[in-house]
């Protein structure tokens, strides 16, 4: 190859190597943009005038030089202890409150009318004349101090004794009229009238079903007292919360009366063989007490299963020929509604309605409150609810003890268990000045506890506070109720205040309850009648007070007017309650050590100081704050569960929730209100639960089903 034909290649290389474009990362986007422009050979455009830059000066970069003096200026995280609770904005109790619409009492109580107790024992009717056996009559008069029958007992006892072979019975009467003895006395008379030798092995003669554990326990107590006239008759109590093993042991020993709640009785029917053996040849009476509550609590299916088992038993008349030749069904209720009518059709056969003051062959509702009951109504704005309750309790505290009474008893009904816990703490836990008597559910106030304005420094308050709701253990509920209902040296001369849910509203015969306060409106008018029925029992006088909010709730008065033919007194929250309680006294602040000078202040100043004392207690005590928050949230949720017929009066949209939070001692509305909120009651983020696998879910559902079948409804 010649030189001319050779190929020449010309390569040009850069000795510095190939430069890659720098990538700018980190920092603010404006800083990255300016640096990118400088790397590209461009200067960032200055939009601000030079004069303005000079006036403002260059912004100093934040550089950590380790200087201790500069670090002092760095703000620290605020802890709960550093918060000055008195520097918060506190809303006034007496401003921005909604005015009440009811200016005139359309159903005014006439104090001049002569009152004849409608549920009192009759003066001219003895039990012996009604057909009750002489042994039982003697026991009633000498041991139980019961001399005369009531109106409902006068009608019911002869009917059951004479017509038990022919018909079932629906017993409808006012609360406190003596329905329990009305069906127990003829049953005892029929058993004792046989003349045969009877003992606990003779079989079960009566099955009595009650909706709540407390009512079942009370019926058991009354039955035990009656059975003391003949020691060979033995009752047995079957309720949730007790050990089934112990109940089975009692059933094996034998019993003549079985009293219990639906869930536990059905559980024994399904799992305890001896209970059917006890009833097979002897069962003659089945009683459903408080039928409306049985339906309301969802026991319809349970009752149906029990009735199927009972009705499948063969009645062997040759063993006890003097007893009815059939199983007699009795349904008792103080109210009549569609649900009770439904229960009566399913459980009663060819039944007879026994009612005082109405037609016996109709289901027309003629329910009314006892004539001797004095009903009062107070319309209080949301912010004034707590302070008004304090004023009402203070007014009761200042009243003298009724003649013949050992202690004053007041019941305050609330809508939910959390609200009960909160109000119990408000009125009993002031600075720890109390002593526990029964667990943490019964507290006697100590000297220096001035939770009510009329209590003086140098005197003992003379107050015992109780709390009762379905979340307490069965043993605690039983002991609390027993302590409240029993006259003893601990309760003598004192004011007993029971804060409770509707668990204590049905059937309980609590002695000498002078006042019932419905602080939260009832969920149904039937609950209203049963609540106020805890007072004015068996001919005794009593008072009931209903709290309502201004606005839509005032229409509730027209709704319940037909149940109060004697009318009511309409109270003004400020004039009739607060001024009487807080005028001409000195309510000291709980955050200052100031000795009382004897100087008195205006009533509104004292009321505000009292409420601020509660608020400061909540802010200083994290556990108390949690109770207040839970009480508020549960109250709001419970408020939304009123029955549809009463929604027009109790609509959550018409309630100022911020003002309502004030009545729970909260200066701010809790952040966590929804059931599915991502934050807890204190505003902290909730941790997401781990996803459950199929196997664990199956076992959890099985355990839940087993528990529901074994446990009683926790009401």
Swiss-Prot record:
<keyword id="KW-0539">Nucleus</keyword>
<keyword id="KW-0378">Hydrolase</keyword>
<keyword id="KW-0698">rRNA processing</keyword>
<dbReference type="GO" id="GO:0016887">
    <property type="term" value="F:ATP hydrolysis activity"/>
</dbReference>
<feature type="region of interest" description="Disordered">
    <location>
        <begin position="668"/>
        <end position="698"/>
    </location>
</feature>
<comment type="similarity">
    <text>Belongs to the DEAD box helicase family. DDX31/DBP7 subfamily.</text>
</comment>
<dbReference type="GO" id="GO:0000464">
    <property type="term" value="P:endonucleolytic cleavage in ITS1 upstream of 5.8S rRNA from tricistronic rRNA transcript (SSU-rRNA, 5.8S rRNA, LSU-rRNA)"/>
</dbReference>
<dbReference type="GO" id="GO:0003723">
    <property type="term" value="F:RNA binding"/>
</dbReference>
<dbReference type="InterPro" id="IPR027417">
    <property type="entry name" value="P-loop_NTPase"/>
</dbReference>
<feature type="compositionally biased region" description="Basic and acidic residues">
    <location>
        <begin position="101"/>
        <end position="115"/>
    </location>
</feature>
<dbReference type="InterPro" id="IPR025313">
    <property type="entry name" value="SPB4-like_CTE"/>
</dbReference>
<dbReference type="InterPro" id="IPR014001">
    <property type="entry name" value="Helicase_ATP-bd"/>
</dbReference>
<keyword id="KW-0547">Nucleotide-binding</keyword>
<keyword id="KW-0690">Ribosome biogenesis</keyword>
<keyword id="KW-0067">ATP-binding</keyword>
<protein>
    <recommendedName>
        <fullName>ATP-dependent RNA helicase DBP7</fullName>
        <ecNumber>3.6.4.13</ecNumber>
    </recommendedName>
</protein>
<dbReference type="Pfam" id="PF00270">
    <property type="entry name" value="DEAD"/>
</dbReference>
<dbReference type="Pfam" id="PF13959">
    <property type="entry name" value="CTE_SPB4"/>
</dbReference>
<feature type="region of interest" description="Disordered">
    <location>
        <begin position="1"/>
        <end position="82"/>
    </location>
</feature>
<dbReference type="GO" id="GO:0005730">
    <property type="term" value="C:nucleolus"/>
</dbReference>
<dbReference type="GO" id="GO:0003724">
    <property type="term" value="F:RNA helicase activity"/>
</dbReference>
<dbReference type="Pfam" id="PF00271">
    <property type="entry name" value="Helicase_C"/>
</dbReference>
<keyword id="KW-0694">RNA-binding</keyword>
<feature type="binding site">
    <location>
        <begin position="173"/>
        <end position="180"/>
    </location>
    <ligand>
        <name>ATP</name>
    </ligand>
</feature>
<dbReference type="InterPro" id="IPR001650">
    <property type="entry name" value="Helicase_C-like"/>
</dbReference>
<dbReference type="InterPro" id="IPR011545">
    <property type="entry name" value="DEAD/DEAH_box_helicase_dom"/>
</dbReference>
<feature type="short sequence motif" description="DEAD box">
    <location>
        <begin position="289"/>
        <end position="292"/>
    </location>
</feature>
<feature type="compositionally biased region" description="Basic and acidic residues">
    <location>
        <begin position="40"/>
        <end position="73"/>
    </location>
</feature>
<keyword id="KW-0347">Helicase</keyword>
<feature type="domain" description="Helicase ATP-binding">
    <location>
        <begin position="160"/>
        <end position="354"/>
    </location>
</feature>
<feature type="region of interest" description="Disordered">
    <location>
        <begin position="94"/>
        <end position="121"/>
    </location>
</feature>
<feature type="compositionally biased region" description="Basic and acidic residues">
    <location>
        <begin position="20"/>
        <end position="29"/>
    </location>
</feature>
<comment type="function">
    <text>ATP-binding RNA helicase involved in the biogenesis of 60S ribosomal subunits and is required for the normal formation of 25S and 5.8S rRNAs.</text>
</comment>
<feature type="compositionally biased region" description="Basic and acidic residues">
    <location>
        <begin position="682"/>
        <end position="695"/>
    </location>
</feature>
<dbReference type="GO" id="GO:0005524">
    <property type="term" value="F:ATP binding"/>
</dbReference>
<feature type="short sequence motif" description="Q motif">
    <location>
        <begin position="125"/>
        <end position="154"/>
    </location>
</feature>
<feature type="domain" description="Helicase C-terminal">
    <location>
        <begin position="400"/>
        <end position="586"/>
    </location>
</feature>
